[in-house]
Amino acid sequence: MPNISTESVNTTIAPSQPASIPKDTATLFNPAKPTAMPAQSSTDSVQPYHHKANHNQNRSVEQSSEVVSAASAKTTTATTNAPVNAAPKIGFVSLGCPKALVDSERIITELSRDGYQVASDYEGADLVVVNTCGFIESAVQESLDAIGEAISKNGKVIVTGCLGKEADKIREMHPAVLAVTGAHAYDDVIRAVALHVPKPDCGLDASYDPKIDLINEAGIKLTPSHYAYLKISEGCNHRCTFCIIPSLRGDLVSRPIDSVMNEALALKKAGVKELLIISQDTSAYGLDLKYKTSFWNGMPLKSKFYDLCQALNDLGIWVRLHYVYPYPHVDKVVELMGEKKLLPYLDIPFQHASHRILKAMKRPAHSENTLARIHAWREICPDIVIRSTFVVGFPGETEEDFQCLLDWLVEARLDRVGAFTYSEVEGAVANDLPNHVPEDVKQERYERLMTLQQDISAQKLQEKIGKTLMVLVDEIDREEGVAICRSYADAPEIDGHVYVDDIDAHVKVGQFLTVTIDDASEYDLFASYKG
């Protein structure tokens, strides 16, 4: 692995810490290059890992291995009577969004509990699992390329994830794959691995139990140890015409609230400082359960978005909400933010502003209503940061429709914006809509949108100069004496950074600092820390 100057997140397992991967290594080696990202903002040429149109959490064989190699440090001392026979090694490639990343974490955790190890490269793996993405056509191609690379470099490959629904397509292109499963088919993946690479025999010492000795309650995480994604539901009840997620992952299925809170508490106990709440439709949480009441810590809790937010707040760590639809009950959650009970950050995929295009998309919102809601939220919580994504060049989009979107952005003054040009996805209803927009027009509109938003972002960040902010340290460059941090306004991977100069040796990754903002660019802040 190449040398790097930044200080890695500590991955050594203590009894109260989850295994995790250093964020530094996240882009050093990818079997399948992340070319399947949607068109990204104009900042990507300068900051290639930020301001993405979607969360992209690609992880490679090498990166996945570092997670469990950290866990081996614990088992070396905690299970000295473990079998001397080498455990089989599984390679892992994880493509796509944070929801898929959580699926990968769960599969790796279960395999590790069964005594498997994670390989550091294709050649050292007894088998490779590829967790695929099928959200847009370029993601499909990236996944197929990753499968092909795994087959050519290893030969024994199991495919899972969203593209697994297209098993015939996968087998037609790659007939050598051993098994294909769909999204969140955890047990099917575990069984397929065990079929082709039998579980290790731990019978030499009956006291050795990898389910107890290897992994703690928090499980293995593919994120740095100070933040983690917490998935609260799967699937979606909406039928947006550009999206095939419901056909890949099904209708909304919410986790009972006690299950969510048990995982959240385990992550806090493991040292996590920030929880990123994710799902396909976060604010619809509990709808399918009819808001069933469960008991947690002796208290009744409804499986309801607002109640969940209240309970998560009581943990006393950062809680960040992603993929929130602007339903009316979100207003009450913003009130919690105004009371300093949640991070004042909302990731809401508005997608467009033209009523005609929103109707063609089958989106459950109207631009005038969303503008009114944004203004109301800022009255309730003046510090609120709003991130959104938009589709440019949707079929039938006219210049008038696009100008409506630009005018809306001027009025809304969003803090963070990602965008991508529309592309066909096999199975999407929008493919059959008339008047598709030429590619050159899509790109020209995309660039105009991002230029406008860049100016808005720069203006908003200039207003931060001279103020103090609490930031969370993600990385440290000891040679330069700079801490790379995030404030409440910055989600990992997709938003900006706060660069803090002249830090001392006592500053650590995962630590909170109170800093003074000295300068700003279009997307990042620059600060000083007095200790």
UniProtKB/Swiss-Prot annotation:
Binds 2 [4Fe-4S] clusters. One cluster is coordinated with 3 cysteines and an exchangeable S-adenosyl-L-methionine. The keyword S-adenosyl-L-methionine applies. It is found in: Cytoplasm. This is Ribosomal protein uS12 methylthiotransferase RimO. Residues 68-77 have a biased composition (Low complexity). GO terms for cellular component: cytosol. It catalyses: L-aspartate(89)-[ribosomal protein uS12]-hydrogen + (sulfur carrier)-SH + AH2 + 2 S-adenosyl-L-methionine = 3-methylsulfanyl-L-aspartate(89)-[ribosomal protein uS12]-hydrogen + (sulfur carrier)-H + 5'-deoxyadenosine + L-methionine + A + S-adenosyl-L-homocysteine + 2 H(+). Its cofactor is [4Fe-4S] cluster. Residues 1-19, 55-67 have a biased composition (Polar residues). Catalyzes the methylthiolation of an aspartic acid residue of ribosomal protein uS12. GO terms for biological process: tRNA modification.
